[in-house]
Amino acid sequence: FDTCHVHAAGYDVVSKDGWRKTLDALDAACGLGLVRVIHANDSKKERGCRVDRHERIGHGAIGSKGFANLMTEPAFENVPKILETPKDEEGKWDREGLAALRKLARKKAGG
């Protein structure tokens, strides 16, 4: 499951209702249980653009709301997530992206 690909294909992962509809479509197509890894990346382009341009977590069109949906989704709680985002030489952007995702996950846990 690649967040940018899904967004670029026109699925709404940002609104709560859109997230539920996206997961329902995925479940109907192949089953949520078959998702074995998630490529977490924001999108430089708008939803439905059919263009795969990754952006740093929280810096694109998916934004924090979309990643809050992902990180608090019970079906994906134990699914590994891989940052597939632009890189800087010092690794600062990856550290920031991981921190943002962890913070969103903690909100579900009440932290």
PLM region descriptions:
Residues F1-R56:
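Acidic/histidine-rich catalytic cores of soluble enzymes
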